[in-house]
């Protein structure tokens, strides 16, 4: 098919050098954004680190999965060398995968974020026309909230902040689905 006409497949992955340190309870390695390129004509595969900032749980606008995507989103990680637990950071990253630039969205003092989830504007074909949603845990008051961020103005204040009546545990993952997808 059409994919073979492209000759080079490019993948962006959140990769760490090893999954664990000394054992499965050692989280001293944190992941970073890498670019893998697979040349279909020559069979060669290359790897390049895109950024030194630790991040994980990468996402794109789900309407662009498996297609060329300009924008990718990662949750920041902190605690490099922490052998006891991976530390979710207080930021999200928006990468322009075409030019390598990265914008940051600060989630607040004393907070830890979660996996970013993309919600596109219904009916829009523009990749960056939508919202990035993130569960945020406040370590100070042990409460959680859902932040909704304009993908096209990523570093700006959230367009909405929804306080939740309980603390969402770390490691929660999710997806955005429309009413039509539920039917």
State what each model feature region is.
Residues 9-14, 70-82, 129-137, 181-183:
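Short beta-strand elements that form the blades of beta-propeller/WD-repeat-like
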Residues 24-42, 88-99, 144-154, 163:
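Beta-propeller blade signature
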Residues 49-61, 102-122, 155-173:
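Conserved blade-ending motifs and adjacent loop-strand segments that build the rim/top face
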């Amino acid at each position: 098919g059409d994919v073979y006409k492209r000759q080079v497949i490019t993948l962006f992955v959140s990769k760490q050098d090893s999954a664990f340190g000394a054992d499965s309870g050692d989280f001293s390695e944190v992941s970073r954004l890498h670019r893998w390129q697979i040349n279909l004509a020559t069979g060669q595969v290359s790897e390049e680190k895109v950024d030194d900032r630790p991040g994980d749980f990468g996402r794109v606008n789900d309407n662009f999965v498996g297609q060329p995507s300009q924008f990718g989103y990662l949750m920041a990680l902190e605690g490099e060398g922490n052998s006891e637990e991976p530390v979710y950071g207080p930021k999200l990253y928006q990468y322009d995968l075409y030019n390598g630039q990265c914008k940051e969205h600060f989630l607040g003092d004393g907070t830890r974020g979660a996996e970013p989830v993309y919600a596109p504007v219904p009916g829009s074909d523009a990749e960056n026309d939508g919202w990035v949603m993130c569960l945020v845990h406040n370590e100070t008051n042990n409460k959680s909230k859902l932040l909704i961020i304009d993908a096209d103005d990523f570093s700006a204040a959230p367009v909405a902040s929804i306080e939740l009546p309980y603390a969402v545990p770390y490691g929660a993952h999710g997806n955005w689905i429309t009413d039509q997808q539920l039917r």
